[in-house]
Structures are given as structure tokens and as C-alpha cells.
């Protein structure tokens, strides 16, 4: 898949520069590292580095989506609910939440300098952000190497929000499992992989309001299903996507793509991600077969 070619090229270029620096004599190394910062060594231009507009290799994906409006965003400010900022107000409205986590990136420090690790992890994170933006995602929060994203909003169908979340995370997972894996295999680096959790909360289950104080605040959601997205990420297998049963229901995607989350022995890890025995509420976590879905 050449959709992420620009991102892969950037990672390869940064790794190549690191090899050159390491091969230099100590005196030259000392001089070279003084200029070895994120901006000077990054293969991306400053405009592309700080823009939400995806890199050129993702253009075919954008075109397949039709007219995609890429607008600048602020973390913690979904445009449909940013009016709640600096208020005591709240509002109920559905949303699909997705938590994308990148695993094993700390192992890069065994082989590369902090500057190179920064460039590699930032490039991977940008690939996730750009992919989600193409599918209408709103970047809510960056958590370490991870990305927390909202899909949906006012004027967007509930089905579309869930399908867009599945599409975005499926493409990104393919990138990590295949394209990115090849780069690190060539370098003898331990696998970097992703784990993703997605859940949908309906209008009466998601409360939007402000968390924090002043500038140390964000417009966020208070919902069981927002919390469960992160929890489902935790039980996903390497390069797996785990979704709540609401996602299956609201997306209307064929049930053949959903199954119990199973371990390497084929045994079910966890049938219910949340249980409230007093209310007889048992909420399923399901593995989403993104690979077959993309075929």
C-alpha cells in the first residue's frame, strides 16, 4: 500500500542520517549533533510538518472520500461543542470515540538518539492524525504516542460516525502492521504495533462539558462509552481493533467481521468489557477483522 509512502520515506531518511552521524569521528559527531534537531533533520517541510493536511501519498485516499474539508483543529475543542468552553454548561449528544495506542516505541531508544526517536514516533502519530482527519475525525487528545479521536457530531449520521472510525483505524492499522513493519525489520528493530479501542455512545449516554480550569481545560465527554474505548484498547491483540457492541449495531456492517476477542490459543479473553449485575447490563467487547474488511 503506497498511501503512506511519504511517511515511510521520512522515517527511512531520519534513520539514514542517524547512521551517518554514528559513523563520524567523535569530533565531527559532536559538531553534527549540535545541528541535529527535529526541524533540521526532518524530511518534511515546515508547512507540512505542522499542517493537518495529509501528505501527498494520502491524496488517493482523500479523493476516494470525495470532497474532504481539512480544517485546523485545537485539541480538546470539538467544533460542535467548543461553545461550552469557559462555561458551566453541558449538552447531551452522541459520539464515537476511538483510542489509538502505539506500543513498543520505547524500544527505539536502544538503537537511536532521542532526536531520531522523536522524529519516528511523531511521523507515526501524524500518520494516525492525518488518516483520522480524512475520515472526519476530531483529534481530542494526544496521550504519549497515542491519539484519542472523536468521530461524529451535529449534522453527521450516527452510522457514518461509526463507519468512519472503523475505516480510519483499519487503514492506519494496515500501515503499522505492513508498511512500518518492513522498515523496522530491515533495521533489526523489535516490532512496533498498534492497539485500538472504539465505542459508540448514544445521545442520552454522552454528556459534553468542560474538564479542568481556565487554559488547563478541554471540552470533553462524560460517558461510559468514552471510557470503554480506552479500556477496549487494553484488551486488543497486537495490531487489533476492539469495538463495543454499539459500534456493531449502529454501523450496520456485516456481522461476519466481528467476533469475540481471543488470545493466541483461540480462547475468549473477555466476553463483557463492562458488567452491571444489579441492572443486568452486560456489554460486549468484539474483535473487528479489519484485514478482511479492507479486502
Q: Which residue ranges define each predicted feature?
A:
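Catalytic NTP-binding/metal-coordinating core of nucleotidyl cyclase/transferase enzymes
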Residues: 83-167
Amino acid at each position: 500500500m503506497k498511501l503512506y509512502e511519504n511517511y515511510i520515506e521520512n522515517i527511512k531518511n531520519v534513520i539514514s542520517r542517524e547512521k551517518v552521524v554514528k559513523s563520524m569521528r567523535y569530533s565531527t559527531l559532536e559538531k553534527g549533533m549540535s545541528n541535529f534537531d527535529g526541524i533540521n533533520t526532518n524530511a518534511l517541510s515546515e508547512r507540512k510538518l505542522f499542517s493537518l493536511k495529509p501528505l501527498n501519498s494520502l491524496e488517493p485516499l482523500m479523493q476516494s472520500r470525495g470532497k474532504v474539508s481539512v480544517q485546523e483543529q485545537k485539541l480538546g475543542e470539538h467544533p460542535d461543542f467548543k461553545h461550552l468552553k469557559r462555561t458551566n454548561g453541558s449538552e447531551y449528544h452522541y459520539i464515537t470515540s476511538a483510542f489509538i495506542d502505539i506500543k513498543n516505541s520505547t524500544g527505539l531508544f536502544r538503537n537511536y538518539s532521542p532526536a531520531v526517536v522523536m522524529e519516528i514516533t511523531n511521523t507515526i502519530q501524524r500518520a494516525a492524525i492525518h488518516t483520522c482527519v480524512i475520515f472526519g475525525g476530531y483529534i481530542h487528545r494526544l496521550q504519549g504516542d497515542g491519539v484519542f479521536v472523536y468521530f461524529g457530531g451535529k449534522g453527521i449520521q450516527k452510522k457514518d460516525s461509526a463507519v468512519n472510525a472503523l475505516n480510519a483505524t483499519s487503514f492506519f492499522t494496515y500501515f503499522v502492521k505492513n508498511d512500518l513493519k518492513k522498515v523496522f525489520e530491515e533495521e533489526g528493530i523489535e516490532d512496533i504495533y498498534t492497539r485500538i479501542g472504539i465505542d459508540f455512545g448514544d445521545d442520552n449516554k454522552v454528556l459534553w462539558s468542560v474538564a479542568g480550569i481556565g487554559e488547563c481545560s478541554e471540552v470533553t465527554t462524560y460517558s461510559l462509552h468514552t471510557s470503554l474505548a480506552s479500556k477496549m484498547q487494553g484488551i486488543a491483540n497486537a495490531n487489533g481493533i476492539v469495538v463495543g457492541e454499539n459500534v456493531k449495531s449502529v454501523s450496520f456492517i456485516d456481522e461476519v467481521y466481528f467476533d469475540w476477542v481471543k488470545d493466541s490459543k483461540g480462547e475468549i479473553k473477555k466476553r463483557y468489557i463492562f458488567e452491571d449485575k444489579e441492572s443486568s447490563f452486560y456489554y460486549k467487547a468484539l474483535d473487528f477483522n479489519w484485514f478482511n474488511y479492507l479486502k
